């Protein structure tokens, strides 16, 4: 886990509840839920869980921020579709398909709304050339066990990373700065704004970590 601080979170556009600065969050435990609008798992599990945490711990000092990002499907994971979801409950693409399949939409819309601040990660054009050094750096950032792999396994990973970078036209600043593995991801900061946890997928230990941070003095 890196040594980034709360101030390293980049929000390009606030869609709901912002702008919020790191100074305004001083003394609070901050949980940043990183998602994509075209990410079924984000809407099936992570965001509903975040709503529960917000309702349970808001008065005890927990602040949750929803941060939409885009590391793929750039035509779907857009600011416009984020605004649509937040303002009307409309979802798109694979998210719509999955939630429809599980009967989790009402009249084609979300049955819930996010009760906390929501913003969009800064997504910019990828201009850095794909060099061997960049491929290796990515491999080590996104796969911490890379150096422990066999030579054959390392070459397979490098090949996959190189192919990914070759077709990657955009980069999301917060997503890459914190070396997130995908969405949903959770980034937890303590009351001092120091990074306490970065997790990918469903996080079973999340509530206990939040409680530990809330119990600590600022």
Give the location of each predicted region.
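Structural microenvironment flanking redox-active thiols in thiol-disulfide oxidoreductases
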Residues: 45-138
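Flexible, glycine-rich phosphate/dinucleotide-binding loops
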Residues: 40, 73, 125-127, 195, ...
């Amino acid at each position: 886990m890196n040594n980034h601080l709360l101030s390293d979170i980049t929000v390009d556009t606030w869609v709901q509840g912002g702008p919020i600065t790191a100074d305004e969050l001083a003394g609070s435990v901050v949980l940043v839920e990183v998602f994509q609008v075209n990410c079924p798992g984000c809407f099936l599990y992570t965001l509903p869980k975040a709503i529960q945490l917000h309702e349970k711990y808001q008065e005890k000092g927990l602040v949750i921020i929803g941060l939409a990002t885009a590391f793929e499907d750039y035509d779907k994971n857009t600011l416009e579709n984020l605004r649509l979801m937040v303002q009307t409950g409309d979802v798109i693409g694979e998210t719509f398909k999955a939630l429809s399949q599980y009967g989790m939409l009402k009249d084609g819309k979300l049955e819930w709304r996010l009760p906390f601040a929501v913003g969009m990660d800064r997504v910019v054009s990828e201009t850095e050339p794909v060099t061997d050094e960049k491929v290796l750096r990515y491999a080590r950032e996104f796969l911490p066990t890379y150096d422990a792999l066999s030579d054959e396994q390392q070459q397979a990973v490098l090949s996959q990373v190189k192919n990914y970078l070759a077709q990657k036209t955009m980069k999301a600043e917060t997503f890459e700065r914190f070396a997130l593995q995908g969405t949903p991801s959770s980034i937890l900061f303590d009351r001092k704004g120091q990074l306490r946890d970065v997790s990918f997928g469903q996080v079973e230990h999340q509530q206990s970590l939040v409680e530990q941070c809330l119990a600590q003095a600022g």
